[in-house]
Structures are given as structure tokens and as C-alpha cells.
Design a protein with these regions (language model features):
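A generic structural signal for beta-strand entry/edge sites
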Residues: 28-30, 46-50, 87-91
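Ampiphathic alpha-helical segments that act as solvent-exposed interaction surfaces
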Residues: 68-76, 96, 100-131
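Charge-rich, low-complexity N-terminal segments
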Residues: 1-41, 80, 84
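A short acidic-to-branched-hydrophobic micro-motif
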Residues: 41-57
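Short, highly charged C-terminal tails/helix-capping segments
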Residues: 127-158
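Short amphipathic alpha-helical segments
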Residues: 2-9, 60-65, 107, 111-114, ...
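Short, internal acidic amphipathic alpha-helical interface segments
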Residues: 52-95
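Short, charged/polar, Gly/Pro-enriched secondary-structure boundary elements
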Residues: 38-42, 98-101
Length: 158
């Protein structure tokens, strides 16, 4: 007969993360740790583990970050990005159901991997958008002289 693992609590998650080498910081309602030099928060409530990754954005390039976040959301269905109310940070969130440490040990690395993939996708999207903006600003409008010459050379068939 298979025995059930004891009920999982935030404190047991913290201990497991310490054993796995995440160097977490225990807070009253969550656990804070780092993913690729970005702040990550883990919350646990009613058998749902939520891992959130936060990183700062440039306020002047808000629109670019917003568009890149939307594209990231479409490319990574398991990760939900959100720009926070202060307009200075983006949060990527990944949730999974889990009621024991054995499952937690299995699902946490997957969630972190998905968050890293989403962060990489977001960086790629930002680079694409910046490059597209540079290309758009590099185009030079045609002069009226070049447009006027087209009419003389083309015949319109009706």
C-alpha cells in the first residue's frame, strides 16, 4: 500500500528549496529567491504553487515591453506575463497544483525552466521590436520628383 506524503506547507517547501540549492529567503507569506539575477517569489495556498519572476523595465520604452510581453504570452501558454501597476516592473507567473513535496520536487524545476524560457523569449521579442523600429526610422521617403516620373513611364490598362 502506497503511503501519502505529509501535507505540504510553506516551511517544508523552504527546506526543500534549501536542499536543492536555491538559497531562498523565507517570508511570512512567501519565499523569495533568485532566477537569473531576477527576483522570484514562490507562494503556496490550497495546493497551488505559484512561482513569479519579476524584472524591471525602462519606462520610456513601456510600449515595446508591453508588445514583447503580449508576444511572449502567445508563445508560452504556461507562463502569464503582466505589467504591474507601477509601470516599472513586469511579472511572469507560472502555477501548478501540488499537495506533497515529492511532486513539488518534480514540478518546481519545470516551472523555473518555463519562466527562463519566457524571459529568453521576451528578450528576443524586444530585440526584434527594437530592430524593426530602427529599420522603420532608417527608411527615407521618396521625393516628389521620383514619384512624378513613374506616371510618365507607366501605362494604365483599363
Amino acid at each position: 500500500m502506497k503511503t501519502q506524503s505529509p501535507q505540504m506547507k510553506l516551511r517544508s517547501i523552504f527546506r526543500q528549496m534549501m536542499e536543492d540549492g536555491y538559497y531562498p529567503v523565507f517570508e511570512k507569506t512567501h519565499i523569495q529567491f533568485s532566477i537569473d539575477e531576477n527576483v522570484a517569489i514562490l507562494e503556496y495556498d490550497e495546493d497551488i504553487v505559484s512561482v513569479r519572476l519579476f524584472f524591471s523595465i525602462d519606462e520610456e520604452a513601456y510600449e515595446v515591453f508591453l508588445e514583447a510581453s503580449n508576444s511572449t504570452m502567445l508563445n508560452t501558454y504556461a507562463v502569464k506575463p503582466a505589467i504591474l501597476n507601477d509601470m516599472k516592473n513586469i511579472m511572469f507567473s507560472c502555477e501548478f497544483m501540488c499537495d506533497n513535496i515529492r511532486d513539488f520536487k518534480r514540478f518546481l524545476p519545470r516551472s523555473i525552466s518555463r519562466l527562463k524560457e519566457a524571459l529568453d523569449t521576451h528578450k528576443i521579442e524586444i530585440k526584434k521590436l527594437i530592430l524593426a523600429g530602427q529599420m522603420a526610422s532608417a527608411t527615407i521617403p521618396a521625393t516628389e520628383d521620383s514619384i512624378a516620373g513613374i506616371e510618365k513611364r507607366r501605362k494604365i490598362f483599363s
